[in-house]
Amino acid sequence: MASSNLFSVGRDCQLVLIGPSGRVDLTHVTGFEARQLTQQIRVTRLDGTNLGTNLPRGWEGEFEIERGSSAAEDLINQTEQNYYAGGAMQFSTLYQYINETDGSVSTWQYSNVVVRLTEAGVWQGDSGVKQKLDFFASTRQRM
């Protein structure tokens, strides 16, 4: 469904995480953030001219979720168990779908994704359990 706004809002974004064993259903994603990582190169030539470039070094970000299942913990458990069994680290793939204001859909693929559970949640009375996952991806490309 196209956005009813002249600008993007949070509900215009959908995320699909494909783990080493298939789709990871993160039930209630309440926030998502991604940042490009770069290595800055700065050069000052002898004539005083300053030049620069930014070399791509991957992407990082985070998911905020309201726990609706054990999916996030299961992904982390699978990664840990594989590591302790002497297995190779396995990567995930993340897809971000954005409903654009013109009615089109932009699809971004984050490749070679590694995930960590930075907040497993606080369990209190009748409160929801908020969790946070951080990720690193080698690349992000438009599909």
Please give the residue ranges for each predicted region.
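Short, structured patches in soluble enzyme cores that scaffold and shape functional sites
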Residues: F135-T139
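Solvent-exposed edge beta-strands and adjacent loop segments
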Residues: A2-L75, V105-K132, R142
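Short, acidic/charged, Gly/Pro-enriched secondary-structure junctions
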Residues: N77-W108
